Regions:
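Ribosome-associated RNA-binding proteins
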Residues: 1-171
Length: 171
């Protein structure tokens, strides 16, 4: 399943989501470059995203990978395989709905959302992205949605209840 664009080094999986050719108009004409959008993660609840520009594609990818590694954040996962509850988020015109799924469902998501789920370590999830197909907005909306979810531990501290009372009521 991994191809030459997906590299795994020191337990961090790097996935290239999008490459774009960019143009800067200067006095003498046009200067061409490339931008790369990358997601990295340890497949155990840590993820980072970055966007970088350079004159050559490999340089842009390398730069984005280094930036993403510096911006790793932790996302709580349920049983290490799915999210705790259904969440919705929006970024720009990109809207995303993430739904927790039962064991064995797999990753039912398209494009950029699938890359995020794979590097995060989510094995069972159903996702629907609406609005734009712009990879940047879809990924930012996905990260927003993942940050919005609350683990049973967080909910129990907010409600002043035991974790066992919260987990019992879950479907």
């Amino acid at each position: 399943m991994e191809n030459n664009r997906d590299k795994k080094t020191d337990d961090i999986l790097e996935k290239l989501v999008h490459i774009n050719r960019i143009t800067k108009v200067v006095k003498g004409g046009r200067r061409f470059g490339f931008s790369a959008l990358v997601v990295v993660g340890n497949q155990a609840g840590r993820i980072g995203i970055a966007h970088a520009k350079a004159k050559q594609v490999p340089d842009a990818i390398k730069k984005a990978n280094e930036m993403a590694r510096r911006k790793l954040i932790h996302i709580p996962l349920r049983e290490g395989r799915t999210i705790h509850h259904d969440v919705k988020a929006k970024d720009g015109s990109g809207r995303i709905v993430l739904r927790s799924a039962s064991k064995g469902t797999g990753i039912i998501a398209g494009g950029p959302v699938r890359a995020v789920c794979e590097v995060l370590g989510v094995k069972d999830i159903v996702a629907k992205s609406m609005g734009t197909s712009n990879a940047h907005n879809v990924i930012r909306a996905t990260i927003k949605a993942l940050k919005k979810q609350n683990s049973p531990k967080q909910i129990s501290s907010i409600r002043n209840k035991k974790i066992s009372e919260i987990v019992e009521k879950r479907g």
